[in-house]
Each structure stands twice: as structure tokens, then as C-alpha cells.
């Protein structure tokens, strides 16, 4: 039995969808343990492209159990839109293939509305929310006023909790100048969701535990990236959940001793969507070249991603915090054609060089990246299928990542398709 965590090692958009899909081939269970439909990833199978936001990547296989854990916040409307989208593409989403935690929190219409109103009120200090209601849903969870999936399954309980929330939230919405919500309309809408959701709902911690006892392989699929973690990310420009490996324990009801490994997905350069610090960001033609070559536009928002050189300080931090057993390096094919390639190996801060990521945004703003320069390679590597086929300079680049982070590279991705994957060693 193996229980592996797959998580983003940067600010998200590292290629987790492709790699989770690839690794899911040998998994029996694929579990989402945090986040919501604010995440987006693309999986390419043959000539078909699937854009997923909430449903685990294992859904593309016929024989996998896919789990939305209690750490996920679920927008029923978004969930069923995604299920309809998948079924239109010929992917069956049955109650045997998809399991939804009865303890997961629901995203309600007032969460989405308040997300937008609060972001607008922040003005120039906005934090770049996707507007999906994720943050407000986690806020309600923390203050114990949230509505869970199990509440939705009991009409009278749901009615009472919804009425209280509508009363409270309408006061807030009025304060922000928004339009009040109608209880009856939402109650009717969500009761319809309850009927459709009921077959999928269960205690997912029991499902996962039972599968592990049968020596089944479990893959825990993270959303966003480690630098968006609520505690270890660039706060407040973060998401509202735990995106590091520790989030699996609370977000899926799994004990830490059950986890056998953690794999960090790292892009061969660095990108970020929205506001927040980004020490190696390139605001010149080089950054634009990376964006266009790498097609760096968000799956969920369509926003252009900010691009920059690879930051090894970030990867070293992620490896330490999540106890990574290996890295998967993606999109190294994008770097083909660059004469010189830089990587950040430290920050100049207050007259000295540091190799850690400061907690304070004010301190981080003072940090200037210290670069090491490498020779690039001209040849396209999209057709490479073994480590030996990679250009020598690409191998030197990858070796630097391993040495600096003290973490081996297990897989190198040279394109978006399943077969554009080079296995270097054991995960």
C-alpha cells in the first residue's frame, strides 16, 4: 500500500493536473483534501482536453474511487456543472466513482456575493480573490456558522441554518451596498442539489481507511500551491486552506503515519496569478517570452500569469515544510531556445545573503534575488522519452535543483500529454 501526497511546490499552476492524472494510473483512490472550485487544471488524454476545477483527476479512469474530502469547500452548482461537463465528454460520474464528504462545508450564494463585495471594498489593497466564495466559506467554517453537506441532507436542519445565515449575511450585504438575498429561492435551489448529491455523500475517512486496509494505493491531490498556504504562504496573498502536506491529515481524516510519501510539482520556472510578492518576476521581454511559450493563462480565471526565473529558495522551503520525498519538474520544454537561464539561489537582505523565505511581506519586499546563470539549450525536448535523451545543459539544470533542495527529482515532464513524461527514479 502507498499513500502519496501530490502538491504544488510554488504558487499553483505547476502542472498538478497532468501529473496527478499520470500517477492516478497506479492509484485506486484519488482524494482532494482542500480548496474548492477556485483551482483549475487541464488534463490531456489523447486528442481530448479536460478542464477540471473540483472533481479529482482520477475521474477520467473507470476503476478509481474519487473523493472530495472534508477539507474541501463545495459549491453544489459548480460541482454539478462539472459533472455535466464530464458526462457530455463521455466520462461517467457514478456514485461508485465519486464520494463526497458529509463533513465538507458548502459554498452558498452569499459567500460568492460577499467575496466580490469585500474585494471591491479593499480598493487598491485587494488580494486578488477569484470571487468563487472560497474565503467567506472558510470564514464561516472557522466561526462555526457554516453549513455542511450533512446539514443539506436534512431538510429541517438545513432550513433552520440557512434562515439564520440569510438574516446575518443580508445585514452584511446591505452594509457593503449589495442586493439582499431571497431565502425561498436559495432554499428551493439547494434542496434540488440535496436530492442529486445524496447518492455521493458518505464518511470519506472510513472509505479511505478501509481501502488502505485492503492495501490499495491512495493519491492525495492538492490544489493551488504551497506558497498559497494559509500559514506558510505569502500572507495575506494566499488561499484560505492548508495547501501543504499537513493539510491531508485534517482535510481527509488520515493519520500522519499513513502517508508514505509527498511529491512536489515544480515548474521549471516560476509563475504567479494575481497580487502578492514574487522575487524573481520578470517584467521585461524575457517574462513575456516565458508567458507566451508556456501559454501562461489561468484555467479558472483566464488571467495572464506573472512569470519569472526559477526560485530555488521557494522549492527548498516547500521541501522542508511538506517533507517532500521527490520533485516532479514540469514544463522544462518551455525553456528550450533560451541562450541563458537563471535560477535564484538566495536573497540579498540587509547586507547579507539568506536562503530562506521571510514571513514578513515588508522584509520580502527588501529581498533582491541572487542568481546563478546556466547555459541554455536550443533543441526542442518535447519528443524526449528518457533522461538520456535530454540535452546536457538541461541535465545540469535539473541537477542544480536536486543539489540545492536536497531532494531528488523523480519525474520530468516535457509536454502536456501523458506520454510526454520521463521517469527518472522512484517517487
From Swiss-Prot:
The keyword Protein biosynthesis does not apply. InterPro entries: Adenylosuccin_syn_GTP-bd, Adenylosuccin_syn_Lys_AS, Adenylosuccinate_synth_dom1, Adenylosuccinate_synth_dom2, Adenylosuccinate_synth_dom3, Adenylosuccinate_synthetase, P-loop_NTPase. Pfam families: Adenylsucc_synt (PF00709). Coiled coil: none annotated. GO terms for molecular function: adenylosuccinate synthase activity; GTP binding; magnesium ion binding. It catalyses: IMP + L-aspartate + GTP = N(6)-(1,2-dicarboxyethyl)-AMP + GDP + phosphate + 2 H(+). It is found in: Cytoplasm. Mg(2+) binds at residues 13, 40. Binds 1 Mg(2+) ion per subunit. The keyword Nucleotide-binding applies. NCBIfam families: PRK01117.1, purA. Plays an important role in the de novo pathway of purine nucleotide biosynthesis. Catalyzes the first committed step in the biosynthesis of AMP from IMP. This is Adenylosuccinate synthetase. It comes from Clostridium novyi (strain NT). The lineage of its organism: Bacteria, Bacillati, Bacillota, Clostridia, Eubacteriales. The gene is purA.
Amino acid at each position: 500500500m502507498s499513500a502519496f501526497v501530490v502538491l504544488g511546490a510554488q504558487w499553483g499552476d505547476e502542472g498538478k493536473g497532468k501529473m496527478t492524472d499520470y500517477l492516478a494510473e497506479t492509484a485506486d483512490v484519488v482524494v482532494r483534501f482542500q480548496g474548492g472550485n477556485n483551482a483549475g487544471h487541464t488534463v490531456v488524454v489523447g486528442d481530448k482536453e479536460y478542464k477540471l476545477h473540483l472533481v479529482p483527476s482520477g475521474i477520467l479512469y473507470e476503476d478509481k474511487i474519487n473523493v472530495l474530502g472534508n477539507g474541501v469547500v463545495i459549491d453544489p452548482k459548480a460541482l454539478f456543472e462539472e459533472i455535466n461537463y464530464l458526462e457530455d465528454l463521455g466520462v461517467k460520474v457514478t456514485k461508485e466513482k465519486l464520494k463526497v464528504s458529509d463533513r465538507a462545508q458548502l459554498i452558498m450564494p452569499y459567500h460568492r456575493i460577499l467575496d466580490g463585495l469585500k474585494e471591491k471594498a479593499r480598493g487598491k489593497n485587494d488580494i486578488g480573490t477569484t470571487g468563487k466564495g472560497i474565503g467567506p466559506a472558510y470564514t464561516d467554517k472557522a466561526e462555526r456558522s457554516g453549513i455542511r453537506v450533512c446539514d443539506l441532507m436534512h431538510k429541517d436542519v438545513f432550513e433552520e441554518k440557512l434562515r439564520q445565515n440569510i438574516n446575518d449575511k443580508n445585514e452584511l450585504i446591505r452594509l457593503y451596498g449589495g442586493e439582499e438575498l431571497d431565502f425561498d429561492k436559495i432554499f428551493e435551489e439547494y434542496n434540488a442539489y440535496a436530492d442529486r448529491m445524496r447518492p455521493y455523500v458518505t464518511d470519506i475517512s472510513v472509505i479511505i481507511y478501509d481501502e488502505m486496509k485492503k492495501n490499495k494505493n491512495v493519491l492525495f491531490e492538492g490544489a493551488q500551491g504551497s506558497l498559497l498556504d494559509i500559514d506558510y504562504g505569502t500572507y495575506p496573498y494566499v488561499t484560505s486552506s492548508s495547501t501543504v502536506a499537513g493539510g491531508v491529515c485534517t482535510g481527509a481524516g488520515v493519520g500522519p503515519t499513513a502517508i508514505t510519501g509527498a511529491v512536489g510539482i515544480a515548474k521549471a520556472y516560476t509563475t504567479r496569478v494575481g497580487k502578492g510578492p514574487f522575487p524573481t518576476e520578470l517584467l521585461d521581454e524575457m517574462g513575456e517570452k516565458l508567458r507566451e511559450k508556456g501559454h501562461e493563462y489561468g484555467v479558472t480565471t483566464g488571467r495572464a500569469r506573472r512569470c519569472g526565473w526559477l526560485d530555488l529558495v521557494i522549492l527548498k522551503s516547500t521541501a522542508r515544510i511538506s517533507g517532500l520525498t521527490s520533485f516532479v519538474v514540469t514544463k522544462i520544454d518551455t525553456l528550450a531556445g533560451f541562450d541563458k537561464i537563471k535560477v535564484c539561489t538566495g536573497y540579498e537582505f540587509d547586507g547579507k545573503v539568506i536562503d530562506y523565505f521571510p514571513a514578513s511581506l515588508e522584509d520580502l519586499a527588501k529581498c533582491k534575488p541572487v542568481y546563478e546563470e546556466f547555459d541554455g539549450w536550443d533543441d526542442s525536448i518535447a519528443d524526449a522519452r528518457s533522461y538520456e535523451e535530454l540535452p546536457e545543459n538541461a541535465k545540469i539544470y535539473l541537477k542544480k535543483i536536486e543539489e540545492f533542495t536536497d531532494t531528488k527529482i523523480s519525474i520530468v515532464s516535457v509536454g502536456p500529454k501523458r506520454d510526454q513524461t520521463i521517469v527518472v527514479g522512484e517517487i
